[in-house]
Amino acid sequence: LRTRVLMDAGELGSRNLSVTWIELPSGAEQTLRSDEEAEQAYVVVRGVGSMSVAGDTQQVAEGDLILVPPATEHAIANNGDAELACVSVQSPPVAAAELYSDQLAEVAGYDDEDL
């Protein structure tokens, strides 16, 4: 799992959004998580996988948008053969360090410097 903050609150004139790029190699998955206040939208940019939202798991592919309401457990997984990439938008903003601090990159080819 690799993440990169594309825009944080206060950048580019934004006050209420943060935008994060997420890459998951084949077989990787996020730790199940939720945020009490933030609404979140994922847009799959490439690859295929599955997204679990409030216990309901659906297959996702390039071009799909997934909405996650506040206080809702969710996770995305790459069950395809190629890398899965998506953009995540949160409002109110959530710091990427808070989102991913509990998940280490324990996938072949990734190390702590990639986070």
Predicted regions and their residues:
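Short, charged/polar surface micro-motifs in flexible loops or helix N-caps
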Residues: 12-15, 24-29, 48-50, 57, ...
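A short glycine-rich, His/Asp/Glu-containing loop-to-beta-strand
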Residues: 1-32, 38
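Short, conserved beta-strand element in jelly-roll/cupin
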Residues: 21-25, 34-53, 89
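Double-stranded beta-helix
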Residues: 75-115
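Short beta-strand His + acidic residue motifs that chelate non-heme Fe in jelly-roll/DSBH
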Residues: 31-32, 51-52, 68, 74-80
